């Protein structure tokens, strides 16, 4: 399969030229740009037997912020699912080879001058690296009657880019678990609930406590 994805924000005001050479604010100098991430994916999957299926995607990433910043990157994702009766297990490995995004900046002299005047660092051409991430998941479906069932699921995101503010934080691995349930009525009504985004945040006294969503 071939897929194209775009995630972006349009009509962002560019105020780097808001003030003219005489120091006057001129709103007519405001222009607008879009910031978007685009992905071109070539995917393949197949069923190895009645229980096991595998697949993968090769992706080309293009990132763009107006006319002054562009990036190209490449990466590979792999996955596998195993199903046995009411149990399902899944593994997704994202950015297996690490995904490299090569950034190039094209700034006008006015933009560069604005960066200096506002005390901001000039962006430099470079490589943005997305390290591998593994997602493990398991689910179990409980059938009560012909038209009623309850599905439980647990997922864990395992990142490899160092300590994160998650339940299990380590170096270089951090683990972020998620729990969820879905109550199914006649395949028409679905009631869902879940727990995730477990983090340490300060309370009113400044003490760190765990919070969940």
Please report, for each region that a protein language model flagged, where it lies by residue.
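Subset of outer-membrane beta-barrel
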Residues: 1-213
């Amino acid at each position: 399969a071939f897929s194209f994805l775009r995630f972006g924000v349009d009509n962002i005001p560019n105020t780097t030229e808001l003030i003219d050479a005489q120091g006057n604010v001129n709103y007519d100098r405001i222009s607008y740009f879009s910031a978007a991430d685009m992905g071109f994916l070539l995917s393949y999957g197949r069923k190895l037997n009645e229980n096991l299926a595998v697949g993968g995607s090769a992706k080309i990433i293009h990132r763009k912020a107006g006319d002054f910043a562009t990036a190209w990157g490449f990466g590979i994702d792999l996955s596998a699912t195993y199903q046995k009766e009411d149990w399902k297990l899944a593994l997704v490995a994202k950015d297996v080879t690490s995904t490299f995004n090569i950034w190039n900046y094209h700034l006008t002299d006015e933009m560069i001058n604005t960066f200096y005047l506002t005390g901001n660092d000039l962006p430099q051409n470079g490589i943005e690296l997305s390290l591998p991430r593994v997602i493990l998941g398991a689910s179990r479906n409980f059938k009560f009657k012909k038209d009623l069932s309850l599905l439980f699921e647990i997922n864990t995101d395992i990142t490899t880019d160092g300590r994160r503010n998650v339940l299990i934080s380590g170096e270089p691995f951090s683990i972020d678990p998620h729990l969820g349930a879905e109550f199914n009525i006649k395949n028409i009504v679905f009631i869902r609930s879940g727990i995730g985004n477990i983090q340490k945040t300060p309370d009113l006294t400044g003490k760190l406590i765990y919070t969940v969503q």
